[in-house]
Design a protein with these regions (language model features):
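Phosphate/NTP-binding elements of NTP-utilizing enzymes
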Residues: 1-188
Length: 188
């Protein structure tokens, strides 16, 4: 999500489209997450001029050299038209309408905007809702279902990070957070 937006603004500038279920949720996303990330990250603060009225930046669009981040609502067919994008971030897809007006599936409409780019990237995330009719569940079932694995610094065993293996003292967080290896049992 936001990490990819950061990477695209800083290292690999490109047109980015963030699609929220509604335009109102998009505005909230921009105000509560995107704007603070830009404000609090010095390198992004330099790239995205949020102060000048001539920069073209608004709550729903942030311009930077080589690209932009545009935030839209899945319920608005007009915002899905005529917009080539390289990176598509679809948030809370279980809350998307079945159709953007009479235009069709908002996810498919947004993905059509990526045809210009051979190296496009699509990120689809959501909190699952109703089992059996959850869009994110369907998307997950259609993937390879791979998990990111990290090596244990002690024995080298590769394993996914699981919450059950995170070790910390909730009464003294200054002691730090560690990960317990599922094979050797040592913490690092």
């Amino acid at each position: 999500g936001l990490g990819d937006v950061y990477k695209r603004q800083h290292y690999y500038p490109a047109p980015v489209l963030v699609m929220q279920p509604t335009l109102e949720m998009g505005q909230t996303f921009s105000k509560d997450f995107l704007a603070p990330m830009i404000r609090d990250t010095p390198v992004l603060r330099v790239l995205v001029d949020t102060k000048s009225r001539y920069s073209g930046n608004t709550i729903l669009k942030k311009n930077f050299p080589g690209g932009h981040v545009t935030i839209i609502g899945a319920n608005s067919p007009a915002s899905l038209a005529s917009r080539p994008i390289k990176v598509l971030l679809c948030d809370e897809v279980d809350r998307y309408p079945a159709s953007a007006g009479t235009e069709g599936d908002p996810l498919l409409l947004a993905q059509k905007r990526q045809t210009t780019f051979w190296d496009k990237k699509t990120v689809i995330v959501s909190t699952p809702t109703i089992k059996g009719s959850s869009r994110i569940e369907t998307e997950f079932q259609e993937t390879t279902r791979e998990e990111w694995n990290v090596p244990c610094p002690k024995c080298g065993h590769y394993q996914p990070l699981r919450w059950a293996n995170i070790v910390f003292d909730r009464h003294d967080l200054k002691k730090g957070v560690r990960h317990k290896c599922e094979r050797c049992g040592r913490e690092s």
